[in-house]
From Swiss-Prot:
A lipid is attached at residue 312 (GPI-anchor amidated serine). Glycans are attached at residues 54, 107. This is Complement decay-accelerating factor. This protein recognizes C4b and C3b fragments that condense with cell-surface hydroxyl or amino groups when nascent C4b and C3b are locally generated during C4 and c3 activation. Interaction of daf with cell-associated C4b and C3b polypeptides interferes with their ability to catalyze the conversion of C2 and factor B to enzymatically active C2a and Bb and thereby prevents the formation of C4b2a and C3bBb, the amplification convertases of the complement cascade. It comes from Pongo pygmaeus (Bornean orangutan). Residues 1-55, 56-119, 120-181, 182-244 form the Sushi domain. GO terms for cellular component: plasma membrane; side of membrane. Monomer (major form) and non-disulfide-linked, covalent homodimer (minor form). Interacts with ADGRE5.
Amino acid sequence: VPNAQPALEGRTSFPEDTVVTYKCEESFMKIPGKKDSVICLKGSQWSDIEEFCNRSCEVPTRLNFASLKQPYITQNYFPVGTTVEYVCRPGYRRELSLSTKLTCLQNLTWSTAVEFCKKKSCPNPGEIRNGQIDVSNGILFGATISFSCNTGYKLFGPTSSLCLISGSSVQWSDPLPECREIYCPAPPQIDNGIIQGKRDHYGYRQSITYACNKGYTMIGEHSIYCTVNDDEGEWSGPPPECRGKSLTSKVPPTVQKPTTVNVPTTEVSPTSQKTTTKTTTPNAQATRSTPVSRTTKHFHETTPNKGSGTTSGTTSLLSGHKCFTLTGLLGTLVTMGLLT
């Protein structure tokens, strides 16, 4: 049999009624409707068989955008010159200017398939208030669009939608989401102060201003604003503090009290005056004369004990200066720390 080989399966003898089947050689296909086997008849004769193998193209190429029409789906014999026809798959539309047919060529290959079916387009997705739609992948069949919200808003609903087949057309798999404004919690209150311009809600970038009550000083920022972190509202920082003014305490000046000073002193003797070293004692009291009607007062020196090198502090300081005004005296005593 031309272009075919019998499948003997190792047999060398063929008794009467033995059936032998043939198989087409490579690049040949069995012609539909023709027998591919013979039988051993009486008298050791084989039954007649016609040529049943012929050159044929392989099963037509599978196309992503189209499928074979019904008569060609189960066919496996495609001799040279055979033409097959396609139909657009769901989700695609026909390009009327292009042919939907392919032909088996002499080299047993199919003619090149042009894209005679184009993807259908989903409807315009529209807009999201306070949000964005990413359509960088297009809106044709099989495309995915994604949704996002502007800063300060939170997305409620699907984050994406796919263009899918819906009946004889295509539609989006999910509706548009909603972008809702994010609010910060109620602003923190402060002691001894107020919040100026309070409102019911505080959205993204909205601020509040603090003010201190009279007599208090603000420590920190006067204003804070609403910001967003992981789709949750939070304040930009802590509130300020209102602190009372501190009263300055009166601290007496530090006075260095000398232990030994050199002052001029006059002895009771009417004819001599000399300088001696006197040691001051802060707790000693000065002896003064009876005050007169004016503010000038006279003080008299107390003669020290013989053999002693010290006198009372007041006496030693006033020695040689017989007259002091009351104001000057008081100032001296304050400086010495004897009066406060």
